[in-house]
Regions:
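Amphipathic alpha-helical segments that mediate coupling or scaffolding at interfaces
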Residues: 9, 27, 61, 73, ...
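Short conserved micro-motifs on helix faces and helix-strand junctions that flank
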Residues: 9, 73-75, 165, 238, ...
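Acceptor/aglycone-binding surface of glycosyltransferases and processive sugar-polymer synthases
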Residues: 67-75, 79-89, 96, 108-185, ...
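Hydrophobic helical membrane-anchoring modules
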Residues: 184-313
Length: 313
């Protein structure tokens, strides 16, 4: 039997936590009874600086529930950092750790399959959605676009995989060697290597509360993923500059020919359009460069990714 830790990041999840803890306790007990997990297995609730009663609930669960552990971050650091904090806290206590969301959308009934594949020798097991029926048309379309862009840019990500995954202790040790401040675990974990496999599941509707990933956060998360793992946007800027330079030379030749043949067109329409076009392209390129420079600025400061305020083992 193996010691299995379930790592659950929480941010303002007071509406779902009681039901989440109830279901996780029942599932973990069944895993222990079936021999997939031992009595030292736990589910670790990580409070990412919540503003509601999330931590108050977690402390109560830890007093009453032998399988519950809690970790509180000193302030809100985002889902990825909260998840990393939980995984690294579980690293020396568990044979493997499985990360999942607190909103009960990840199907916990497939946890058995994760552990079975771990016992078969896999160090990383990815949870992959069978379909995206619970998402809106807009979210489905943007998600597909995101994964396609990532693959075009050469980033190794698993299609339709979020953060529902199992990692062995060896994989967690490898993960601890990555010190990026700008975290994108979906891109980092495949870089670890080791033997991996997939578990396919159906994602449920959110049990209660609201999504903690509105459109603004999703766009920011996608941009972080792109700029953290690929320099192709910078190369595209260079290629775009070469293309525009070539077009400018052709335009200049056309203008000179028109001037000397007496066919010059009066008016400023073409000039104004060119100025607006080139100005827009320049601003876009500056924005891309600024995004990369901002990441460099964050990384070189080497500030802590999170700070643990309290840990309830």
């Amino acid at each position: 039997m193996s010691t299995v830790y379930l790592v659950i990041p929480c941010y303002n999840e007071e509406a779902v936590l009681p039901e989440t803890v109830k279901r996780l306790t029942d599932k973990l007990q069944r895993m222990i009874d079936s021999g997939r997990a031992d009595e030292n297995s736990r589910f670790l609730l990580v409070d990412d600086g919540s503003k509601d009663k999330t931590w108050e609930l977690i402390t109560g669960f830890c007093r009453e529930n032998v399988y519950c552990s809690g970790l509180k971050l000193a302030h809100n650091r985002g889902h990825q950092n909260a998840l990393l904090a939980g995984l690294l806290a579980a690293k020396d206590k568990a044979d493997c750790a499985i990360s999942l969301d607190a909103d009960l959308q990840d199907d916990i009934e497939v946890l058995d399959q994760f552990v079975d594949k771990f016992h078969e020798g896999c160090d990383v097991v990815y949870g992959v959605r069978n379909k995206r029926d619970t998402d809106s048309f807009f979210k489905r379309s943007t998600a597909r676009g995101f994964y396609k862009v990532m693959h075009i840019l050469g980033v190794d990500v698993v299609y339709d995989h979020a953060d529902y995954r199992l990692m062995s202790r060896r994989a967690l040790d490898a993960l601890s060697e990555y010190h990026e401040v700008n975290l994108f675990l979906r891109g980092i974990v495949p870089l670890i290597g080791y033997r991996s496999d997939y578990v396919f599941y159906d994602r449920h509707e959110r049990f209660a509360g609201e999504s903690k990933y509105p459109l603004k956060k999703m766009i920011s998360f996608a941009l972080d993923g792109i700029t953290s793992f690929s320099v192709k946007p910078l190369k595209l800027i260079s290629n775009l500059g070469i293309l525009i330079s070539c077009l400018s030379v052709l335009g200049l030749l056309y203008a000179l020919i028109s001037y000397f043949t007496g066919n010059a067109v009066a008016g400023w329409t073409a000039i104004v359009c060119s100025i607006w076009l080139l100005g827009g392209i320049q601003l876009l390129c500056i924005g891309v460069l600024g995004g990369y420079i901002g990441k460099i600025y964050s990384e070189v400061k080497a500030r802590p990714r999170y700070r643990i305020e309290e840990f309830l083992p």
